[in-house]
């Protein structure tokens, strides 16, 4: 029999392939990577648009061949990665868009172990990244702890570090001409060493009179070469503000209209940013932040100012997310500042770069580059019906990539879901060549998202639940060896003997893996699809008389009669056979337990 890789003269092709108008099962058996990629690329289109092609793949062994391609593992070669991603996309299209019989065939083709391995690999990387971030933060806090001890005072009651500061200023004044005399306001009791007390704390037109001399004097001073104490940055800010009523908001007075317009401060914008002086500029909220850091006169803008400056609508009828129990009230007090583009206190060491005009990013809306246009495909929240002309396109695109609406960006500004990808955090400060080589074998965010979405569609059939609760990991897809190679101080691992997948016991329950993605440090889209999968676990089996299973994965007991187990009082969806199971499951169930009306 002729090999399919041999040439076919009548069609002038090197091998059999799939086109957008022709499906040939023999093309999936091609052993050459390039024509197989070409066929998979066209097959991804066919599985999206043609229900007949999806049905044919379930009976001619096409799904089994695609799953075999996935189980071969992800290689570091670019062409192999491309082939793996296209095959995975085809299987997801078949499972998501197919009928019940087609989805059943996807599960029976042993696709669940592939998904379980992808989710487990991602969880391992996230756990290592969080552990590494916690250790680094602990080291930094312990390193800066001795510096936070108050300095001893001399006999006159003046702190010793102020004496050293004045002595350093005297030595500097001998080497260069003194700067112009500027009126200095009264010093607070605990003033920050690194805060320049040369700028008078007056109204905005008077604050815009400082020149470049102040910056030149600071750059020549050796006291600003090292990072300053972060613990003392709050005190000068509190003392620099005039006395005010603490009854409303955070003790901040409402900002006047002449202060909230960026066009009222033309001198402060020169050299700091190239954006036009307009309240609708997308990066307008960053400008008051830089001004406040340079002058230490922090006037917090109101809620209406931040919404108008970022291009968002002032109305409060944005949609309530399906993942949150709390809804944003329509009427909000004026001085509330807990928004996405609020002005937090950064490290004082970064003020040099801000005043000097150095291009250093201080945006708070950190987005993962991998969550760009692709993530929009899996956006699951319902958009708000506000006028689109009032929404900033830049902010809306960033929020859409995370599955959020612009009206809800304020509620989740400080959510850990806005952190960069765990891979970028984990591979930071590591060998670039080794990190990039291992990164290619790890699942991407979109792979995890598509896996959860596929599970959400196939897990709602109770007759397939045994496939999810009794699964295993694919040995060629596991990344334990790659992760251990990146650990500091570890020797290269000898390649272990390859395990036979069909000899592994089916002792992996995929639902506990999915439940970990309901935690809030994952993206909103991952949380949504993971919650859908967990709610499918609580479905009653109509084929067995409408009985339900205990929602605690270590129990798994089924009801003997309908309505035997008690439901969760909050969500009215999950059932537990006992109080002990409910208490044990609450560790993760609280993340996807949402009250029903």
Swiss-Prot record:
Keyword vocabulary terms for this entry: Cytoplasm, Metal-binding, Sporulation, Zinc, Zinc-finger
Residues engaged in binding Zn(2+): 568, 571, 589, 593
GO biological process: one example: ubiquitin-dependent protein catabolic process
Annotated stretches, region: Disordered: 133-230, 268-287, 292-341
Single GO MF descriptor: zinc ion binding
GO cellular component terms attached to this protein's record: cytoplasm; MUB1-RAD6-UBR2 ubiquitin ligase complex
Transmembrane segments: none
Compositionally biased residues, Polar residues: 271-284
Compositional bias ranges of the Basic and acidic residues kind: 214-224
Subcellular location: Cytoplasm
MYND-type zinc-finger residues: 552-593
Signal sequence, start to end: none
InterPro entries per the UniProt record, alphabetical: ARM-type_fold, MYND-type_zinc_finger, Znf_MYND
Residue spans of biased composition, Acidic residues class: 312-328
Family: Belongs to the MUB1/samB family.
Purpose: Involved in determination of the onset of polarized growth and morphogenesis. Plays a role in the regulation of branching in hyphae and spore formation.
Protein name in the entry: MYND-type zinc finger protein samB
Organism: Aspergillus clavatus (strain ATCC 1007 / CBS 513.65 / DSM 816 / NCTC 3887 / NRRL 1 / QM 1276 / 107)
């Amino acid at each position: 029999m002729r090999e399919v890789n041999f040439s076919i003269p009548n069609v002038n092709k090197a091998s059999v392939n799939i086109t957008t108008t022709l499906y040939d099962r023999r093309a999936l058996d091609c052993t050459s990577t390039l024509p197989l990629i070409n066929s998979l690329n066209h097959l991804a289109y066919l599985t999206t648009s043609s229900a007949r092609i999806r049905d044919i793949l379930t009976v001619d062994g096409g799904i089994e061949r695609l799953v075999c391609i996935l189980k071969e593992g992800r290689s570091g070669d670019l062409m192999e990665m491309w082939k793996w991603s296209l095959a995975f996309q085809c299987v997801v299209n078949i499972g998501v868009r197919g009928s019940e019989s087609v989805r059943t065939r996807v599960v029976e083709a042993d696709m669940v172990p592939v998904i379980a391995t992808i989710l487990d690999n991602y969880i391992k990387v996230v756990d290592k990244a969080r552990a590494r971030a916690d250790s680094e933060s602990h080291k930094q806090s312990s390193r800066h702890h001795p510096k936070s001890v108050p300095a001893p005072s001399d006999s006159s009651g003046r702190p010793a570090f102020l004496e050293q500061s004045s002595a350093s200023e005297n030595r500097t004044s001998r080497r260069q001409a003194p700067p112009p005399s500027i009126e200095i306001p009264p010093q607070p009791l605990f003033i920050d060493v690194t805060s320049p007390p040369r700028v008078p704390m007056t109204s905005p037109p008077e604050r815009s009179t400082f020149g470049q001399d102040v910056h030149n004097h600071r750059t020549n001073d050796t006291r600003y070469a090292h990072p300053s104490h972060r613990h003392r940055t709050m005190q000068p800010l509190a003392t620099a503000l005039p006395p005010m009523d603490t009854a409303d908001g955070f003790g901040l007075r409402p900002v006047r209209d002449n202060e909230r317009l960026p066009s009222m401060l033309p001198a402060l914008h020169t050299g700091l940013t190239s954006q036009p002086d307009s309240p609708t500029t997308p990066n307008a909220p960053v400008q008051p932040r830089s001004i406040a850091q340079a002058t230490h006169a922090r006037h917090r803008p109101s809620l209406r100012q931040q919404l108008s400056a970022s291009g968002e609508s002032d109305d409060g009828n944005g949609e309530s997310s399906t993942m949150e129990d709390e809804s944003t009230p329509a009427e909000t007090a004026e001085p509330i500042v807990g928004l996405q583009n609020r002005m937090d206190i950064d490290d004082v060491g970064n003020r040099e770069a801000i005043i000097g005009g150095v291009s250093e990013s201080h945006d708070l809306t950190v987005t993962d580059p991998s969550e760009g246009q692709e993530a929009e495909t899996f956006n699951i929240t319902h958009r708000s019906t506000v006028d689109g002309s009032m929404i900033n396109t830049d902010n809306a695109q960033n929020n859409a990539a995370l599955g959020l609406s612009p009206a809800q960006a304020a509620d989740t500004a400080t959510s850990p879901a806005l952190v960069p990808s765990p891979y970028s955090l984990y591979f930071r400060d590591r060998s670039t060549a080794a990190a990039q080589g291992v990164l290619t074998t790890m699942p991407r965010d979109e792979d995890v998202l598509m896996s959860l979405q596929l599970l959400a569609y196939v897990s709602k059939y109770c007759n397939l639940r045994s496939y999810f609760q009794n699964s295993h990991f694919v040995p060629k897809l596991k990344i334990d060896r790659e992760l251990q190679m990146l650990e500091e101080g570890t020797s290269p691992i000898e390649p272990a003997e390859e395990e036979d997948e069909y000899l592994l016991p089916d002792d992996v329950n995929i639902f506990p893996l999915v439940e970990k993605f309901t935690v809030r440090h994952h993206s909103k889209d991952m949380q949504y699809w993971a919650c859908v999968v967990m709610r499918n676990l609580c479905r009653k089996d109509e084929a067995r008389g409408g009985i339900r299973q205990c929602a605690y994965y270590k129990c798994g007991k089924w009801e003997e009669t309908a309505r035997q187990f008690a439901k969760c009082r909050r969500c009215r969806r999950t059932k537990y056979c006992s109080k002990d199971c409910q208490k044990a499951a609450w560790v993760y169930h609280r993340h996807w337990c949402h009250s029903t009306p």
